Design a protein with these regions (language model features):
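N-terminal cap/lid segment of alpha/beta-hydrolase-fold proteins
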Residues: 1-24, 28
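Short, surface-exposed "cap/lid" segments of acyl-processing enzymes
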Residues: 24-63
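Conserved alpha/beta-hydrolase
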Residues: 51-81
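Alpha/beta-hydrolase active-site loop
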Residues: 56, 87-108
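Accessory cap/linker subdomain of secreted extracellular hydrolases
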Residues: 141-218
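Short beta-strand/loop motif that positions the catalytic acidic residue
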Residues: 224, 230-232
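Conserved alpha/beta-hydrolase "acid-adjacent" motif
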Residues: 237-243
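Catalytic active-site module of serine/aspartate enzymes centered on a nucleophile-bearing elbow/loop
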Residues: 263-267, 271-320
Length: 320
């Protein structure tokens, strides 16, 4: 397999990515990353300049390549080598970038079926491409069937239970309710028209948050008639694992859904239910081989049996 540095244009903005090529492809996949300032590999730039190297889309690209599926993954606007401004990019622009990436992939892939594989926020865009009939199938990793506003509330409740005991005590002493504080911040964002705001001292992309809070994926999911794969970790605290079943109830095409054991939102084991507090430690482990095998197996079942034979090797190769 080989990785080629490529660029394509979206609404006049240069988007940089990696095309992973294979011989005799059975399909080709567009990989769409999750929320935050992340690059093509799903590595995130955190406040203060620190980087969280999750490598989720890189691992998927490597597994797919061994299974005979070339892929394109790309940096978000204002991240990695892409142009544009991350802080003023909303969900509509992210969808436009996904569509432009799919057009580039279609021209390069040479007539094979096109797939969209999204993680977290990327599942919304993968689902939209599937609903529009632009792809032959969609894989949704850590996806949701609820509005963004409901997801933010659910996240806050989950994360509050995972705070260290000392932090929970401080919140009680200060008479601070985490859920109420989250709602207050959300109301501030929704009442503003600014692209960028400061919330609790942190710079946030308010434009994206307004888009996300309003967004309801259910009507889009209900229009999908192509095959869909949904995978969420049983310890995910950023989207409800049970939404896998909700996605399955909404889509009209062939559906395969999995809630995988003790995996977190980063597709890695979280046996202690640490949530984001444990992310920096968990990324020392590889992306779950089970998840990679489920993806390549799903591709094989719909678009080519060669992916099954190659997929076992993909798990070991991409999981290192």
């Amino acid at each position: 397999m080989s990785g080629e540095e490529v660029t394509f244009s979206s609404e006049g903005c240069g988007i940089a990515g990696t095309f992973t090529e294979t011989a005799d492809p059975v399909a080709a996949a567009l990989l769409i990353t999750g929320s935050g300032r992340v690059d093509r590999d799903s590595d995130a730039r955190l406040p203060g300049g620190l980087k969280l190297r999750t490598g989720i889309t890189r691992a998927i690209a490597e597994a797919l390549a061994v299974a005979g599926v070339p892929s394109l993954r790309y940096d978000k606007r204002g991240a990695g080598r892409s142009g544009g401004d991350y802080w003023t990019t909303g969900m509509d622009q992210r969808l436009a970038d996904a569509r432009a990436g799919l057009d580039w992939l279609a021209a390069r892939a040479g007539g094979v079926p096109l797939l969209a594989i999204g993680h977290s926020e990327g599942t919304f865009h993968a689902a939209q491409l599937a609903a529009d009939g632009a792809v032959a199938g969609a894989a949704l990793l850590s996806g949701s069937a609820q509005t963004g506003g409901k997801i933010l509330g659910w996240q806050t409740r989950q994360l509050a239970t995972r705070l260290p005991a000392s932090a929970r005590l401080i919140l009680r002493l200060m008479r601070t309710d985490a859920v109420q504080a989250q709602r207050k911040n959300q109301d501030r964002i929704m009442a503003s028209s600014a692209d960028v705001m400061r919330i609790q001292g942190q710079r946030v992309n308010a434009r994206w948050f307004r888009d996300f809070i309003r967004y309801d994926p259910a009507p889009v999911l209900a229009r999908i008639t192509v095959p869909v794969l949904a995978i969420t970790g049983g310890q995910d605290v950023q989207v409800p694992p049970q939404d896998v079943d909700a996605i399955g109830a909404l889509v009209k095409g062939p559906f395969e859904g999995h809630i995988v054991g003790d995996l977190s939102h980063l597709m890695r084991p979280d046996p202690d239910s640490a949530g984001p507090r444990g992310y920096r430690r968990s990324v020392r482990q590889p992306v779950s081989p089970e998840v990679l095998a489920l993806i390549t197996g799903w591709v094989a079942s719909h678009w080519g049996h060669r992916a099954t034979a190659r997929g076992a090797g993909a798990v070991d190769e991409a999981g290192r």
